[in-house]
Amino acid sequence: MADKMWGSEPFWGLGYEWDPDWFYTERQKELRALLIELCEKELRANAKRSDDELLYPRRNLEVLGEHGFLALTVPEEYGGLGENHVAYAMTCETVARYGCASTAMCYVMHMGAVNAIMLRPTPELIDRYIRPLGSGKIGTLSYSDPETGSHFWYPISSGAERMNGGFKVRKKASWTTSAGFADFYVVQTTSPDFSGYDDLSVFVIDGEHVEAQPALWDALGLRGNQSGPLEVPDIEISGDQIVGPVGDGAASNDESVDPWFLIGSSSVWNGIAMGAIDIGKRHTTRKRHVDVGLRVADYPTIQDYVGEAVIDTNASRVFVHSVADAMDRATENNTKQLAPGEFARADFLHWAWQIKFAAAKNVARVVDKMLHACGGSGYKRDMELERYLRDAKAGWVMGPTNEVLRQFVGKAVLLGFEVLDYWNQTFNRRAVENEVKKLDPAAKRELAEQLMTQADEDEAKKAQPAKA
């Protein structure tokens, strides 16, 4: 096995023997070596500037674009590298580990937008948004909503209507990575002629039609993300800018947006964890206590910290790569074109929830333990560990939050997938009946009258003719 290099010197962290290389093709190993080289030459140095100055990492993204990574999973016939889910996981992890976590997260959102378009490609979308990726065009996803928080799949503050052969789109988002900096935005809104529940649609909005406030972003970590509020203020777009048919949004979530985002973001958290371990190894093997003649790495407690961190992080890495590999198998190595109504990645969505939970939980613990291992030196900014620590804390709270995910999994295991009421449409009959039992007869009659009035109003609304 070749030595892992950092410039002209052997890498000072963990070697390739601690990486899950059995998942990778020879080409993917070459891509990883190229990424490490790019991180050493430029990306890692730029990470400090992004963190210090709240600077959007455009230059780092341009570097990735110069080597084809902005079109990593795009078929070669459209100018991409034609790679798969495993290569994507490797890329996100590698950039976060050796380079810049903010760049890695912006990259995740960029690839989320790219793959949402590639789920339902049209010649117009390909020519307008996919082929230009080679010239450094950057996309992002805008799916959050100020009214629903981390329940990003429920866009209340949005809408679209048909107009002049195209659409008028309005969108408000509380969090959008690359807001104000991306060249195009893949957004989700309620559909034209919204029929309720999961009737959602996906559109691509050009950057000049988006209003953003990047100056408001000043966070604990991932300080280059510029993940600020965004608005699309009733913009008219052409009919070519819808992604998939009207009403395809929920299917797009399950088949593209969620799987790609969860694989990518989980890989970022794993990369941050490995990067912190790399720094911990470098410090503890070099720092000596002259009075006892030992390096910090010679103490059993430090060995325990590092050993457990490596074991837990590699368990998470293999978990992520396994789910990515399963999606590769289901999609014929990311080459299968699915028609609306067909699913492949969505069959593994409940596994994708688990990898995000595991990776985010693990990285928060690992960075703390590496700080303990490095002691006061790790608390200082010049070691970089404190930046990794701050970046890591985004994992747990980034939507879907770990609280949401573990409830999804617990509910699905105990009660079945059908109880996962994403759009708040199914009532809990047991809870309702239990609450009604507490009412006296007068209160029950009052509630019944109120419900009958609401039922009459709902029936009247349904009877109204639809707008042309």
Predicted regions and their residues:
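Glycine-rich beta->alpha junctions and the first turn(s) of the following alpha-helix
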Residues: 217-314
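Alpha-helical scaffold segments that form or flank carboxylate-/histidine-based iron centers
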Residues: 258-262, 295-309, 347-358, 386-394
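Glycine-rich phosphate/pyrophosphate-binding beta-alpha loops
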Residues: 174-180, 260-265, 395-398
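Glycine-rich flavin
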Residues: 48, 52-66, 70-177
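Short, contiguous pre-domain boundary segments
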Residues: 8-24
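C-terminal helix-coil-helix/basic helical segment that borders enzyme active sites and/or dimer interfaces
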Residues: 47-52, 314-358, 371-379
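A short core secondary-structure module
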Residues: 172-213
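Glycine-rich phosphate/cofactor-binding loops in nucleotide/flavin-utilizing enzymes
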Residues: 3-10, 374-468
